[in-house]
Amino acid sequence: MHKVFASDFFNFEFLRLLGTVPFQGAEVGECLTTAGRIKDGDPESWYRAWRDQAEKAQALAEEAAAVGDRTGACWAYIRAANYWRASEFLLHCTPNDPRILAASKASVNAFDKGWVLLDATVKSFEIPYDKDIKLPGRLYLPAPHHRLPGKIPVVLQTGGFDSTQEELYFYGAAGALPRGYAVFSFDGPGQGLPLRVGKLKLRTDWEYVVSQVLDFVTDDIAPEYDLDLERLAIFGASLGGYLSLRAAVDPRIKACISCDGPLDLFEITRSRMPSWFINGWLSGWVSDGLFNWVVDALTAVNFQIAWEFGHGKWVFGVETPADVLRVMQQISLKGGYLSKIKCPTLITGAADSFYFTPDINANPIFEGLTALGSNEKHLWIGKGVEGGGLQAKIGALAVVHHKMFTWLDSTFAIKRDVL
């Protein structure tokens, strides 16, 4: 695979943007020009370059809107939203940096201006969560000429460790709408604005979060918008793949797509550390103080490690690297949890992932679905960047759309004419 950046981390995040080009999330020329302004491994240059490109895309959107170019304005606003999202992404080592919230709000604002111009109906909602807390959600409905017969099948889309609801559009709604599916996406605790504004931390029992969202969808949304609750699926990618499996035990979910999710987040992190060091910490031989000192020393020379632990502390609401690992120990599907899933399930893996390799994730997850027959569960391992081999199918979103909706069509008995 050709690399734009020598750093695997920077290259992956660049491809994350570039991969949205087919769905108006970026322009190739804009991305290549922006990449030329970034110093590999330097998050400040990354922020400045994508901020500048976001401003340029937003200016193009406003120029198009001023002359009545609906399509041009829509596409440019959506690109601007994605560039704003990317700009603040590598600043998460210091969550109190005011640029994070400013760029996040700019991303949401640009996306809100873009979706009203889509060839679809999009509605924004506030989902009752806990007490007076509400979560942001969006319902995407297919245009009349894309409608399938009967009620509208719907995909409930959950984010993951570092996504925002605006980015989820490219993974879900962009592929669902022209195929006649509705999508309901949301940002939960530890994600998007609930993290940045509400300071809500990620919950490891994500099934609780989704139960609140499902209450809202089934009671308030489905009747008004003709959603088919007998054809309701959940979809999540990367950590979202894990979260979707946590939620799939709810009987209201009729199908689950878990894209490249982990089986046990702590065991994955453990496998990337020297065994004597992590085992010493687990046994108490290595103290928290020493563990934290070593990790902090590594973050000074390895930006990827710095970002992963910095973002982890923020999302999990903890103060030290040792505490990050303690939360990770709770993020596991072991112990029989997978046997509780009764709905048809598609598991995907990424053969070339440097995060969640299939041998210790997708494969054992698939085998753990013991309540499902061979015709109720399916495993797909993507290979190569062009075939969905990178984590979360980065660079192959059209491929994952095809695989996912072909499987959902079969699961929900949706028939289409041969072309």
UniProtKB/Swiss-Prot annotation:
Molecular function as annotated in GO: hydrolase activity
Arranged from A to Z, the UniProt key words for this protein are:
Hydrolase
Gene3D superfamilies cross-referenced by the UniProt entry = acylaminoacyl peptidase (1.20.1440.110), alpha/beta hydrolase (3.40.50.1820)
**Enzyme Commission number(s):** 3.7.1.-
Which InterPro entries does the entry link to?
Answer: AB_hydrolase_fold (IPR029058), FrsA-like (IPR010520), FrsA_esterase (IPR050261)
Q: Which EC class, in a word?
A: hydrolase
Cystine pairs: none
Residue ranges that the Swiss-Prot or TrEMBL entry lists as coiled coil? none
Keyword Manganese on entry? no
The pathway where this protein functions is: Mycotoxin biosynthesis
Which PANTHER family does the record associate with it?
ALPHA_BETA HYDROLASE PSOB, DIENELACTONE HYDROLASE DOMAIN-CONTAINING PROTEIN-RELATED
Q: What does this protein do?
A: 20-hydroxy-prefusarin hydrolase; part of the gene cluster that mediates the biosynthesis of the mycotoxin fusarin C. Within the cluster, FUS1, FUS2, FUS8 and FUS9 are sufficient for fusarin production. The roles of the other FUS members are yet undetermined. The fusarin C synthetase FUS1 is responsible for the condensation of one acetyl-coenzyme A (CoA) unit with six malonyl-CoA units and the amide linkage of the arising heptaketide and homoserine, subsequently releasing the first intermediate, prefusarin, as an alcohol with an open ring structure.
What is the official name of this protein in its record?
20-hydroxy-prefusarin hydrolase FUS2
Organism this protein belongs to: Gibberella moniliformis (strain M3125 / FGSC 7600)
